[in-house]
């Protein structure tokens, strides 16, 4: 299961005339029964929401007041995500005859009073923003939005935006839907929102949400795989200048090439672009080649030594579950047998985490021949290699257990000889010989039925962090 969270707007999406229909509530229960979470993201003031929605506990969390308030309906805990409006601001609105209501943080009025609101903000020199929701006008602290509220909720739930399906109908839903892994507009959505959505339902509000849940979400959106494959990362430029890209949820990868031909650079480019797009990456590093990735925000390098944190799978699980942290596991301080055993432990832990949260999104194993040698493929037993987002990196593909090597459906190679000779002999990629690759060049090879369906030569994009080889300990 990839999509673990449904994040939905209230008015005009889940609710019609202020209420959620019984059939829609039943559909939300089916989402929760599937093991997924449900998040409400609404512009309504919290007190008002609790009045009109007695079934509030159907949600795991609530983002209210357009991102300004985070509410746990089970613990009844409220967290303000911004500062309340000043007395001077409220007095200024009243003086201009603006009808308004206040929540914990939000100030709400209606069109056409946005002009008086803006005049008051300017006259007092306040750092406030105006947000429109059809005929409603909301005033919030700068930087507060449904998107910022979504981020706070995801941190609390320990989930990633990429494992979230969002659904809404109005202008103020745009920012938060853009941050989800799949954006849905109900049929009654404003045209601008519908134009940017991945899917527009055929029926409005709650009926549209039911259509999404029963027709797509409970099947993990498998019918929309072509749309999901459009999310790509750049790898470099082809000879004719066009950008060579790889689908983030494409086939599992094998990155290969002789020593010194740039396969670590190519791997680093892949990882850096995944990190830039907020994907959670788990990289097993038997030789300590990727320590410099610690320069990236949101990634932790765990050092290796017998009994260190890098050999305790529980430490990695804790980081991933609670902080959505990308991790490099540096195993260079272990001997080969210890590396194989540590790999088995880590993959077992990561499999559990993927089942629970969908993350880490990518699992990369460098020097795969060290930890998956022929006859020792059991290091990967219990790990679902069929899940997209697996990358094996090795200069010796012939020294990787065949049952592990078989998971790759795409090859990136920095050495034409490795492809035309070693992989061809293994029956993995029947690629004809060609002009040797120059420095910084690579091949992108789509596999199918033991042959290459497509071969593309490209120049690898530069890395943003340096590669510093470290001597292997085993």
How would you label these PLM feature ranges?
Residues 233-234, 240, 256, 437-474:
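Conserved P-loop NTPase motor module
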Residues 229-362, 372-399, 403-412, 474:
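P-loop NTPase catalytic phosphate-binding loop
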Residues 389, 394-450:
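Conserved ATP-driven motor cores of ASCE-family P-loop NTPases powering translocation/secretion/packaging/pilus
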Residues 17-105:
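Active-site phosphate-binding/coordination module
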Residues 86-179, 188:
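Conserved acidic, metal-coordinating active-site core of Asp-based
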Residues 2-18, 177:
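Asp-based phosphoryl-transfer active-site loop
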Residues 1-2, 21, 140, 147-229:
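Mg2+-dependent phosphoryl-transfer enzymes with acidic/Ser/Thr/Gly-rich catalytic loops
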């Amino acid at each position: 299961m990839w999509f673990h969270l449904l994040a939905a707007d209230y008015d005009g999406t889940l609710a019609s005339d202020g209420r959620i229909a019984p059939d829609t509530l039943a559909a939300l229960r089916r989402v929760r029964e599937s093991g997924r979470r449900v998040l409400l993201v609404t512009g309504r003031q919290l007190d008002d929401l609790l009045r009109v929605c007695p079934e509030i506990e159907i949600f795991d969390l609530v983002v209210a007041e357009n991102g300004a308030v985070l509410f746990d309906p089970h613990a009844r805990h409220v967290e303000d995500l911004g500062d309340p409006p000043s007395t001077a601001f409220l007095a200024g609105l009243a003086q201009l005859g603006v009808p308004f209501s206040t929540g914990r943080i939000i100030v709400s009025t209606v069109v056409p009073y946005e002009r008086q609101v803006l005049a008051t903000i300017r006259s007092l020199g306040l750092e406030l923003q105006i947000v429109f929701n059809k005929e409603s006008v909301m005033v919030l602290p700068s930087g507060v939005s449904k998107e910022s509220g979504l981020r706070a909720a995801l941190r609390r739930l320990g989930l990633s935006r990429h494992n979230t399906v969002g659904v809404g109908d109005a202008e103020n839903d745009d920012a938060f839907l853009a941050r989800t892994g799949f954006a849905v507009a109900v049929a009654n959505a404003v045209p601008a929102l519908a134009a940017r959505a991945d899917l527009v339902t055929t029926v409005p509000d709650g009926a549209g949400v039911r259509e999404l849940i029963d027709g797509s979400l409970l099947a993990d959106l498998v019918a929309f795989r072509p749309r999901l494959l459009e999310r790509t990362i750049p790898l470099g430029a082809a000879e004719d200048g066009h950008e060579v890209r790889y689908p983030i949820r494409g086939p599992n990868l094998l990155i290969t090439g002789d020593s010194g031909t740039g396969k670590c650079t190519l791997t680093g480019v892949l990882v850096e672009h995944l990190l830039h797009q907020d994907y959670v990456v788990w990289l097993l590093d038997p030789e300590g080649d990727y320590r410099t990735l610690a320069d990236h925000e949101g990634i932790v390098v765990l050092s290796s030594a017998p009994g260190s944190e890098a050999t305790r799978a529980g430490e990695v699980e804790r980081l991933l579950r609670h902080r959505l942290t990308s991790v490099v596991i540096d195993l260079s301080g272990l001997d080969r047998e210890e590396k194989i055993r540590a790999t088995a432990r880590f993959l077992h832990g990561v499999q559990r985490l993927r089942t629970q949260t969908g993350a880490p999104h990518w699992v990369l194993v460098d020097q795969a021949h060290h930890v998956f040698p022929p006859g020792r493929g059991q290091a990967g037993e219990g790990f679902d290699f069929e899940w997209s987002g697996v990358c094996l990196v090795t200069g010796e593909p012939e020294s990787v257990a065949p049952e592990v090597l078989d998971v790759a459906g795409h090859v990136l190679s920095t050495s034409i000889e490795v492809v035309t000779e070693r992989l061809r002999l293994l029956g993995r990629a029947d690629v004809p010989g060609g002009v040797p690759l120059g420095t910084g060049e690579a091949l992108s090879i789509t596999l199918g039925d033991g042959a290459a369906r497509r071969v593309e030569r490209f120049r690898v994009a530069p890395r943003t962090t340096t590669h510093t080889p470290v001597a292997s300990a085993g």
